[in-house]
Amino acid sequence: MRPSYPTTPGTFQVDLRGLVDLLSRHLYRSPDVYVRELLQNAVDAIAARRRLEPGVAGAVEIEVVEPADGPPTVVVTDNGIGLTGTELVELLATIGRSSKRGELAQHRDFIGQFGIGLLACFLVADEITVVTRSARDPDAQALCWQGRADGTYDITPVDSDLTAGTRVHLRARTGFEHHLTRDHVLALARRYGGLLTLPIRLGSVQVNNEPPPWDFPALTMEHGRESALAYASRVLDLDPLDAIPLHADGVRGLAFVLPYEPSPAARQDHRVYLRRMLLSESADRLLPDWAFFVRCVIDADDLSPNAARDGFIEDERLARVREQLGRGIRDHLKDLARLWPARLAGIVATHDAGISALAVHDDECLLLFADWLPVDTSLGRMTLGEHARRFGELRFVRRFDDFRQVAPIAAAQGRCVVNGGHVNLSTLLERLAVLRPERRISELDPTEIVDSFADLTAEERSEVADLVRLAETALRSHDVGVQVRAFAPSQMHATLVTNEDSRFRRQLDRTRSVVDGPWSGVLAALPTASAANSQLCLNVANAAVRELARQARQGSIMRVRRAIELLYVQALLLGHHPLRDRELGLLDDVVLGFVEDRG
């Protein structure tokens, strides 16, 4: 009995139309890449011929035919190496193999790296016609290869005026006519091939007549910098703060400092070329993560493009280039610090987060940039350099909440306290304290603010004794101590001073109140730290507090108690401390008591 399956070797049957649809949806971002693929094949073919005939002058001609009664046709002609009949069969007819694959594997002066080749042209055409004549044989006959979207093809000899080289004809698919119109093809040719060195023409129009930005005069010269900034405005629609020259192994380009502060998590949209052919206008992962404040334009010789040809493969070469480009940006900023400090000041004012991220890992950069880093203080925003000139010693608090707590009091006292709650800032200040001990940089404990308040006289302590006793009774269940001091600003009734342990306990209590299930048991088992260092400091310089002291002496116990509870909740809110359930209930009870005019 004969088996129901073939017993001889077979080949996979490829649904070409389905494969093209897959490419269009998942590999290529736009069918417009067909122009890039045609230009790439032409450039590669000319590079191959130059290896055979070093003196040949390469050229690429594009023609667009737009008949009144039919779809447009695009014709791309090059005077490259051409193809023999054997190559047509072995290469063009084999899905997944580039028409230049063998040579591409051997020579770095070719752009192409993948066997997508003419397959991309099926994104916009149902039929591709290739007329070619090989330069390897002076007697070679011109051949015509016709491939169709159903996966069939045929090869025939033809009479053609084509000398050595290749001519590709594409006729627009239904629904894709716009992609093959003259204006659209011209725009795409300029976009993808505008920086290629080979002359490319569409009819009488020279497509590539602009020098690449990395060939501008040295950016240390003002006219070179102006040319680079003008390029960014014209091509990238960007008005950058500065232009930075980039150099790495086989890579050259420019980095433009953004005129706004992007999110560190934002995608880096860089413009990348491979041997002057545009690959992508939205590539990322080219620079270190800290360099999110620049957008670059680069050209690479040896980096490997990914399958979609819209970026580079993440490999050791790209990692090395990324490190080198980051070093170049860092060195440029160092040069600005020495030579153009005003320019650097403008950059740091906009991108202090990125500069800080760089300085965290580089002591030299920290020393260079420290004086330009802006900080928020109790006396307003200023640079660290300005702070050093005005105040000498620098005191900072580590947390935003601590800064909110101490800032109004410190400002009223004329003290300049730095908010170290911003990303990396506390780390930078601690490191700067080690590198520059003469700057006298140290962390401020918020309790030091209370310690700086003037002590009361014996008479004043006697006047507020009843108030302190009532306040301690009212707040005992909240584990809060009470002090009375006189401090500025007099408009502040009270301030709540906490330490790390009391903040942890407050957050733990708040979490316990909203968590149930297995985690509630875990939280219940956690040890509870003492909150003895949480202190409500009443301000006797405030008229309302003095009135409460008077009423306490007169025995208005309930009214004073309600007022103390209200001042406690107010201090919590002003200090941005999380309210626990019992404090929310306390606030509700206090408000209700005043509404009902109890006590």
Regions found by a protein language model. Name each.
Residues 1-188, 588:
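GHKL (Bergerat-fold) ATPase N-terminal catalytic module, capturing the glycine-rich phosphate-binding loop
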